[in-house]
């Protein structure tokens, strides 16, 4: 009467198979959730990349437009002399350094050849006696140059064309200003 019930073993097998199937389904569900999360993360990253690329393209287009406008202005103003202001100190140096006002205008009209800075102290900037801390443009060539303050148009320095040993101002960076 207490003999082994063959159905009891079969039921247990089915029960074990059901548990394995349940675990497998849970595993599949977890992996699907992880896959869905990764897919959403990828979609978000793709959207961010697309936005960044659009932003970069707009900035590059704006830069290209600005460079085009700058080049148009440069072409339009090529050979034109900026409103030069020559103070008494520079006028006093001109004859002894081999310069005339026409020499200065001609040198400037040939175009920029470098950059510098105007860092004159207040006592060296009559009539306003306000110190300067401005970018400046260099015209000419080493040993034969004119430096003009970009903001004020003042000629801030002329080299000594008569002195073959003239040492250029250390603030001068030679090279076409528009190529930098």
Swiss-Prot record:
Keywords: Antibiotic, Antimicrobial, Bacteriocin, Endonuclease, Hydrolase, Nuclease, Plasmid
Ranges of Basic and acidic residues composition bias in the record: 54-76, 160-171
Domain of life according to the entry: Bacteria
Pfam families tied to this protein: Colicin_E5
Start and end residues of each stretch annotated as Disordered: 24-143, 155-180
InterPro entries hit by this protein: Colicin_D/E5_nuclease, Colicin_E5_C, Colicin_E5_C_sf
Biased composition (Polar residues): 106-116
Residues covered by region (Nuclease): 74-180
GO biological process, alphabetically ordered: defense response to bacterium; killing of cells of another organism
EC number, UniProt record: 3.1.-.-
Enzyme class: hydrolase
A Gene Ontology molecular function term of the record: RNA nuclease activity
Nuclease is among the record's keywords: yes
Record keyword Flavoprotein present: no
Family to which the UniProt record says this protein belongs: Belongs to the colicin/pyosin nuclease family.
Functional note: Colicins are polypeptide toxins produced by and active against E.coli and closely related bacteria. This colicin is an endonuclease.
Record's protein name: Colicin-E5
Protein's organism: Escherichia coli
């Amino acid at each position: 009467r207490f003999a082994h019930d063959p159905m009891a073993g079969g039921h247990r097998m089915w029960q074990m198979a059901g548990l394995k199937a349940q675990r497998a389904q849970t595993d599949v569900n977890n992996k699907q959730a992880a896959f869905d999360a990764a897919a959403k993360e990828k979609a978000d990253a793709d959207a961010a990349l697309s936005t960044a690329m659009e932003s970069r393209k707009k900035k590059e287009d704006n830069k290209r437009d600005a460079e085009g406008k700058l080049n148009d202005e440069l072409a339009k103003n090529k050979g034109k002399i900026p409103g030069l202001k020559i103070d008494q100190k520079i006028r006093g140096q001109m004859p002894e350094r081999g310069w005339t006002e026409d020499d200065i205008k001609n040198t400037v009209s040939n175009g920029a050849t470098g950059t510098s800075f105007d860092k004159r102290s207040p006592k060296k900037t009559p009539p306003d006696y306000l110190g300067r801390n401005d970018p400046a443009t260099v015209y000419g060539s080493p040993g034969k140059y004119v430096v003009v303050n970009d903001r004020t148009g003042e000629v801030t320095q002329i080299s000594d064309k008569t002195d073959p040993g003239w040492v250029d101002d250390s603030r001068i960076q030679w090279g076409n200003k528009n190529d930098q």
